[in-house]
Amino acid sequence: MIFISGLTESGMKISENEQTKQHKKMFELSDKLVLELKESDVIIISVPIYNFGPPATLKAWSDLVARVKETFKYNEDGSRVGLLQDKQVYLVITSGGTKINSKEDFLTPWLIHVLNFFGIKNINIIAADQMALDYEKSIKDAEDQISKIT
């Protein structure tokens, strides 16, 4: 996974002609990820909570798909509008000890905010949380949530 850096920021502000091979490689992956989102009607994101928050790779993914004029745009007043409407998202979230939507869960509200930023509002959460405490119950609860969706 490529992580956002000064190289990425500079690449977003210069013309394609001025981009280095490193810039082009980063944008190649970003373009691919953005296209996947645009072409998908249904998106499933399966993610664990690591130390109360998202894994670094999920943060990197969100940075790579947050592209002006691709996944969001600025209005004249500076406000932002997401460009990925009419998507259905299923978040399958697991944790060892963190209760989903508790004060300790920084992943779920962050990820919902990111998806809303892109214009995605139709989000279903399937939680398999606190698996280290009662694995069988966590799996059963997740299966029950899935059966209500399908």
Identify what each model region corresponds to.
Residues 101-150:
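Glycine-rich phosphate/pyrophosphate-binding loop and the adjoining helix
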Residues 1-47, 52-60, 133, 145-150:
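N-terminal beta1-alpha1-beta2 submodule of the flavodoxin-like/Rossmannoid cofactor-binding fold
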Residues 24-28, 70-76:
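Short gly/ser/thr-rich secondary-structure transition/capping motifs
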Residues 44, 90-92, 124-126:
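Hydrophobic/aromatic beta-strand patches that form the interior of the parallel beta-sheet core
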Residues 75-117:
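Short, glycine-/small-residue-rich phosphate/pyrophosphate-handling segment
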Residues 40-41, 86-87, 120:
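Short, well-ordered alpha-helix to beta-strand connector turns
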Residues 49, 95, 129:
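Residue-level signal for short, function-critical loop segments
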Residues 59-71:
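A mobile, often basic/glycine-rich helix-loop segment
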